[in-house]
A protein has these predicted regions:
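An N-terminal assembly and electron-transfer interface module characteristic of large anaerobic redox
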Residues: 1-167
Length: 167
C-alpha cells in the first residue's frame, strides 16, 4: 500500500474548506486538530498553552460554520493523533503556518521532550517554570497511579488501539 489511508484522507478533507484568503493569522492561537475527540481541559498541552497565554481551538468545540472557519486563524497547527498528521501537516503547508506533531505518550521522557519542543517552538521564556511544572505533573501522575493500583490490585488490565492509537 502506498499513499495515505482512507482515514488520513478523510481527516485531510475535513480541513480543506479553511481558506487562507478568509483567515487572518493569530500568532497567539493554536488549533489542535486531527483527533477523534477534544483534549481534556486538564491535559498537559492545554495547561502549558494557557500558561504561555495562547488561545486553543479544536474542531469538537465548533458549533457554527464561523467557529469552524476560525480554526484556520491559528498561527500554529498542532496534531497529537497519528492518523491526523498527514491532513494537518498539509493544512499547515497550504496556509503557510507552523506545524507541530506531538503524539500522545505514556513515557515521561517522551512527554518531557515534546513539552520542551512545544515550549521552545512558541518562544516562551522561563525554562525553570517549565521544568518545575513538569516535575509537579509527574508527581501527580505517580500519585494517581499508586491510588489506582490500590483499587485494582493485581487485576490484569488490557488497553487496545480503540482507546489509544499508540502502545
Amino acid at each position: 500500500k502506498h499513499g495515505p489511508t482512507p482515514d488520513q484522507k478523510l481527516r485531510k478533507a475535513m480541513y480543506e474548506p479553511l481558506n487562507p484568503d478568509r483567515n487572518k493569522m493569530d500568532t497567539k492561537q493554536i488549533s489542535i486538530l486531527g483527533s477523534d475527540f477534544a483534549l481534556d481541559l486538564s491535559c498537559d498541552l492545554k495547561e502549558l498553552l494557557a500558561i504561555a497565554g495562547y488561545k486553543v481551538r479544536e474542531l469538537q468545540d465548533c458549533s457554527t460554520w464561523e467557529e469552524y472557519e476560525e480554526l484556520g486563524n491559528a498561527g500554529t497547527f498542532l496534531c497529537c493523533y497519528p492518523s491526523g498528521k498527514y491532513g494537518i501537516e498539509t493544512l499547515a503547508e497550504r496556509l503557510r503556518r507552523a506545524f507541530l506533531y506531538l503524539p500522545l505518550s505514556f513515557d515521561y521522557e517522551e512527554i518531557r521532550s515534546e513539552e520542551e519542543t512545544l515550549w521552545n517552538s512558541l518562544g516562551v521564556e522561563g525554562k525553570q517554570i517549565l521544568s518545575e511544572w513538569m516535575e509537579k505533573k509527574i508527581a501527580l501522575c505517580e500519585e494517581a497511579l499508586n491510588h489506582a493500583k490500590q483499587i485494582i490490585g493485581n487485576a490484569p488490565i488490557t488497553i487496545d488501539y480503540t482507546f489509544h492509537p499508540r502502545p
